[in-house]
Amino acid sequence: MAKIKKDDLVQVISGKDKGKQGKVLRVFPTDERVLVEGVNRVTKHLRAGQDNNGSTEGGLQVVEAPIHISNVAVVDPETKKPTRVGYRFETVEKDGVTKTVKVRFAKASGKEL
């Protein structure tokens, strides 16, 4: 189970892009990989051919490639540093009804994510 979700701000903690921060665009849970904005950019060679709209030009295109989930850490909203993620149960009262909800929080500061 991945503790990193879409739209989380993460920092790369190992690899060629170590230290870079970006927003998670997509999570691939079966492959344990995440697609992070501006990180692990690779050059893709496109062949000239056809697509749904007609013909396409060939050439080079720079795109983000997925990175393994163990190489990124969620950024703490308070300290702006990478942190681990924990879960806790909080009671919320809404319209006179008390509910228990599971909440993700940053272990370094205790702030809710």
From Swiss-Prot:
SUPFAM superfamilies xrefs: Translation proteins SH3-like domain (SSF50104)
The keyword RNA-binding appears for this protein: yes
One GO MF term attached to the UniProt entry: rRNA binding
Cellular compartments per GO CC: ribonucleoprotein complex; ribosome
Keywords from the UniProt entry: Ribonucleoprotein, Ribosomal protein, RNA-binding, rRNA-binding
Pfam short name (any one): KOW
Source taxon at top rank: Bacteria
GO biological process, one term: translation
Protein family according to the UniProt entry: Belongs to the universal ribosomal protein uL24 family.
Described function: One of two assembly initiator proteins, it binds directly to the 5'-end of the 23S rRNA, where it nucleates assembly of the 50S subunit. One of the proteins that surrounds the polypeptide exit tunnel on the outside of the subunit.
PANTHER family: MITOCHONDRIAL RIBOSOMAL PROTEIN L24 (PTHR12903)
Record's subunit section: Part of the 50S ribosomal subunit.
Stated name of the protein: Large ribosomal subunit protein uL24
Organism: Micrococcus luteus (Micrococcus lysodeikticus)
Primary gene name: rplX
